[in-house]
């Protein structure tokens, strides 16, 4: 298991913040900053924030 993800799980547990942190880490590793940005935009949309004006 990945040490960073393991530590995130220890600190945040199965909270929304922990899940977001895990998704951001995985996205960054797979697609770099653009991938992390996409995950963050999707998360903000789920919270009801208007992200239409944010550049991709």
Swiss-Prot record:
Q: Keywords in UniProt for this one?
A: Cytoplasm, Cytoskeleton
Q: Does the keyword Zinc apply?
A: no
- The answer to whether keyword Cytoplasm applies is yes
Q: Write out the GO cellular component annotations.
A: cytoplasm; cytoskeleton
Give the UniProt subcellular location, in the record's own words.
Cytoplasm, Cytoskeleton
Q: What role does this protein play? A: Part of an actin-like archaeal cytoskeleton.
The miscellaneous comment for this protein is:
Belongs to a conserved five-gene operon within Thermoproteales denoted Arcade (actin-related cytoskeleton in Archaea involved in shape determination).
Name-wise, this protein is: Arcadin-3
Native species = Pyrobaculum calidifontis (strain DSM 21063 / JCM 11548 / VA1)
